[in-house]
């Protein structure tokens, strides 16, 4: 059975943890759609277009991965794109409660979608976009946390 997965997120910026999840998902699913959310609830460092551009650049090496802009509810995009799986990452137990609530809401809105949770590789379990931005603001080492292109964009942005 060929299954398409959608992986939504703000990706402000995309991290090595995000990329690890996409890489692993690309080995499981026929195709993975990375959906960059506008997300009016968050104050982002990077613009919508910049986040989309970084995701496209970083993930271009994965042949069965597409990056789209998410301009409506994820479940609506999933239905239109015939994605059967909503992919979510769980770094810690603290993520679990929110993600289960979101999963139940998504399934209520689109009974054809299932949420699948992947935990990150241990070396990425503590990485978040917020922490990465803080490290960049303090001119810390970013090489192990983000792609070179993202590091360059971060350094330019936080000067």
Task: State what each model feature region is.
Residues 1-159:
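Nucleotidyltransferase catalytic core that binds NTPs
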């Amino acid at each position: 059975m060929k299954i398409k997965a959608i992986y939504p997120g703000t990706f402000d910026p995309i991290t090595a943890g995000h990329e690890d999840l996409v890489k692993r998902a690309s080995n499981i699913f026929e195709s993975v759609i990375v959906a960059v959310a506008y997300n009016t609830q968050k104050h982002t460092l990077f613009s919508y277009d910049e986040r989309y551009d970084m995701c496209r650049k970083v993930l271009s090496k994965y042949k069965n991965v597409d990056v789209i802009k998410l301009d409506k509810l994820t479940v609506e995009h999933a239905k239109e794109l015939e994605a059967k799986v909503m992919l979510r990452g769980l770094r810690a137990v603290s993520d679990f409660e929110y993600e289960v609530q979101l999963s139940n809401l998504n399934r209520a809105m689109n009974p054809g979608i299932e949420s699948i949770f992947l935990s990150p590789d241990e070396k990425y379990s503590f990485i978040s976009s917020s922490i990465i931005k803080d490290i960049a603001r303090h001119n810390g080492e970013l090489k192990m946390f983000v792609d070179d292109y993202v590091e360059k964009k971060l350094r330019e942005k936080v000067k």
